[in-house]
């Protein structure tokens, strides 16, 4: 993983953690080293599932368990 993140401007090349002052390295809710705002669609609705939204505090995209 160190080699995978070595060119990432958000990643400290020694620790592979976010650089000082940055929130995240990668993920569907990470953009330019910062968490996307809460309510940003990170996975659009498909089939019977509703949209999934960023929380604003994580780079992960939590699944919305609510069906249409």
UniProtKB/Swiss-Prot annotation:
A GO MF label: toxin activity
GO cellular component annotations of the record: extracellular region
Keywords: Cell adhesion impairing toxin, Disulfide bond, Hemostasis impairing toxin, Platelet aggregation inhibiting toxin, Secreted, Toxin
Disulfide bonds: 10-33, 24-30, 29-54, 42-61
Keyword Disulfide bond: yes
Motif range (Cell attachment site): 46-48
UniProt keyword annotation of Secreted present: yes
Subcellular location: Secreted
Tissue: Expressed by the venom gland.
Boundaries of every Disintegrin domain copy: 1-68
Note: The disintegrin belongs to the dimeric disintegrin subfamily.
Task performed by this protein: Extremely potent and selective inhibitor of integrin alpha-5/beta-1 (ITGA5/ITGB1). Partially inhibits adhesion of cells expressing alpha-IIb/beta-3 (ITGA2B/ITGB3), alpha-V/beta-3 (ITGAV/ITGB3), and alpha-4/beta-1 (ITGA4/ITGB1) to appropriate ligands only at concentration higher than 500 nM. Weakly inhibits ADP-induced platelet aggregation.
Subunit structure: Heterodimer with EMF10A; disulfide-linked.
Family: Belongs to the venom metalloproteinase (M12B) family. P-II subfamily. P-IIe sub-subfamily.
Xref: PANTHER family: ADAM A DISINTEGRIN AND METALLOPROTEASE DOMAIN (PTHR11905), ADAM METALLOPROTEASE (PTHR11905:SF159)
Protein name as it appears in the record: Disintegrin EMF10B
The organism of origin for this protein: Eristicophis macmahoni (Leaf-nosed viper)
